[in-house]
Amino acid sequence: MLEINLNHYNEMLRYERDMDELRALALWITRCDPNLSIPGLAKPREYVFDLIQHYSKKFAADIKQHANISPDSIDLFHSSLFSVKLILGITAQDLEEASQQQLYRNSGFWEMRRFIGQFGDVAEAAVSAGVTHIVSAAISGCIIGEYLGLLMDEQFHQPVPVDHMVFLRSGALPIAGLLRQQFQICGDHVLIADDAVMETRTAAVMLKKLREICPDVKISIMTVDIDPETKYSEFMKQFEQVYAFDE
């Protein structure tokens, strides 16, 4: 399997096919009974959350070190998911449905390549602002959030937990957020990592979920793409900080 190089835009479609595998896992979580038990897999829902996090972090580490997702990581990813999909009953139709549920095409993690040099500045600002927890919008925000977490840890010696929120959807629109069963907010300042804030729907769902867990927590947001009208809207004033990127 060839590497996926961030500098080659024509590799986006191949990258997106791999991300559809993770999107199908997220879709499975939304349909799963939280108490489901599978022989040999006592807590499948939590295991799938672990898989999403493991590969998001692995891909982020590859990008930080090599500016690409390595062939070994991709091979391991496909080998692991082949077995997992069989066990969970995830089909090609599920992958297609998960792909179609994206709000935005040609956005998400792939677009971070335009701003890769600015992530260090955001990490430094997040450390200075006292960010204690990152929650990513799955799936497109997962690698973005993990990448930022790595920078905060390795460059600024401020490790923070990174979690991933998946979404129940009506069509492509998120209507509710789901987190691990044992999820707890760490500290008092959460940073939402989202791929694109071209509207307020996803961010609103994430805000609601986090406020249900801890009404007084401070919440900031980082996004790769943001609609200018949304950026200066009343809605965005709910956030402590809004971290965006300059072309």
What does each model-identified segment do?
Residues 1-247:
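PRPP-associated nucleotide enzymes
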